[in-house]
């Protein structure tokens, strides 16, 4: 028997909450110790485990600020959720290798979260609307 929708939502919302507070340790606490963390297109490729995943979040939190995630849709399976969200905030650094110049930024994300039996996120796969980011960076 898989997790309930409410339990999956609570874990994802907790994960996004730690991200909004730039809390690397909090984010990692929502992930299983052997997590597969796959940000599609990230230069170093998929990471496995907390130690390999930490650098992504450290870079992300220095490159983006004042972030808010708005959930648009969620689709559920027994032990997974597909989450479509909209991220809005500022880009003081170089998010995803693109100069941010501390301007406002918004882009859609598609997450596939898979859960371990204990409720930890055992796989996080993220697809980012890079075209939207590039378009916003090329104007202004």
Where are these regions (language model features)?
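Basic/polar N-terminal segments that are highly enriched at the extreme N-terminus
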Residues: 1-10, 138-140
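A solvent-exposed, acidic/Ser-Thr-rich amphipathic alpha-helical stretch
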Residues: 5-10, 24-78, 86
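Generic hydrophobic alpha-helical segments
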Residues: 14-15
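A short local loop/turn or secondary-structure capping micro-motif enriched for an aromatic residue
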Residues: 46, 91-92, 130-134
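Short beta-strand edge/turn micro-motifs at domain boundaries
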Residues: 82, 104-135
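Generic short beta-strand segments
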Residues: 84-93
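Short, surface-exposed loop/helix-turn segments at secondary-structure junctions
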Residues: 92-102
């Amino acid at each position: 028997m898989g997790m309930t929708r409410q339990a999956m939502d609570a874990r994802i919302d907790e994960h996004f909450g730690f991200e909004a507070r730039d809390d690397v340790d909090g984010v990692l606490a929502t992930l299983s110790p052997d997590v597969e963390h796959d940000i599609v297109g990230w230069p170093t490729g998929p990471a496995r485990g907390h130690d390999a995943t930490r650098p992504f979040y450290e870079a992300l939190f220095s490159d983006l600020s004042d972030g808010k995630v708005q959930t648009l849709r969620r689709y559920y399976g027994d032990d997974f959720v597909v989450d479509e969200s909209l991220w809005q905030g500022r880009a003081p650094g170089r998010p995803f290798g693109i100069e941010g110049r501390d301007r406002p930024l918004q882009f859609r994300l598609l997450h596939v979260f898979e859960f371990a039996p204990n409720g930890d996120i055992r796989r996080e796969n993220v697809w980012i609307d890079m075209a939207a980011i590039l378009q916003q960076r090329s104007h202004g």
